[in-house]
From Swiss-Prot:
Residues 334-353 are annotated as: Disordered. It is found in: Cytoplasm. It comes from Bifidobacterium animalis subsp. lactis (strain AD011). The keyword Methyltransferase applies. The keyword Cytoplasm applies. This is Ribosomal RNA small subunit methyltransferase H.
Amino acid sequence: MTDFSQIHKPVLLQECVDLVTPALHASDSVAVDCTLGLAGHTIAFLKAAPNATVIGIDRDEEALDKATARIAQEGLSARFVPVHAAFDQFDEVLRAQGVSRVQAVFMDLGLSSLQIDERERGFSYAHDAPLDMRMDTSQALTAREILATYDADRLAHIFKEYGEERFSKPIAKRIVQQRQSSPLETSSQLTALVDAVIPAARRGSGNPAKRVFQALRIEVNGELDKLRRTLPQIGLHLAVGGRLVVESYHSLEDRTVKNFMAQGLRVDAPADMPVIPPDMQPFFKALTKGAVKADAGEIAYNPRSASVRLRAVELTRPLPQRWVHAFELESQGSEDGVRGAHGHRRRTQARRG
């Protein structure tokens, strides 16, 4: 029997349980774990909410198999439904299960321990490995293919947009030059190339290649696009009183989650309206004050929690399709100056849960 506790430490586990399980008291409650991984959070949810069923989604078949086996070891299989899918197939997954509304949705947007620790997956710059970075190994696109085929402008764009890399253009130029003589095949080759480009005086903390690796991983797996598509789907399927709980690990993810939640926390009425009618009240109630971060004890126990940002909201009234459409349009444009469906700027709702 595998001791998964030695290889998998769920981040902010108790905080997530405390946020998710109050919505799971009814006997027919359904929660969705959009990022099952090795099921650390899901097992805790199942134990804390004995009347609930959890649908566990993961695009990594190996992780899904291991998680399913782990849940069986815990004797919890009767209330668990494993699904091999990407989380942007949320609507499709629920339709296939005959579910229209769910009481809780959880997302842990970080890499799973399995993905980080298996060197051949190529996610970590700490170990030499093939430049793969696929979460779903059945897909075709790999980091190696991106580095071998994207032109300099496209490479620079993803390094800047997804990695917030200041030296995106010179790094992209060097990659194109390098591949004319020999392709970049391994993580150590890429790390050495980036190390040679970034001046020592301009480096921040950590490995100089960390932003490039982040950008490649996001591009390979379409992470931000999938997240932007998924959040509105989740909103439409949450029951009133249902909760959305999200852990993110870099600023781009957190910004996307924060903006989605912030739109639902705003009052859809002019700032000078003295009494706010029910149909202009916020759609969400905040369950966290800003983002919850790991404390020193958590970080000492689980160093991978150092960058986590945990946000949670509760749905207070159903989201209309027009609101979801407005978010989709907004996410394609500026993230500032969010406006309501009536064309006026919406004011921030101060009440916190």
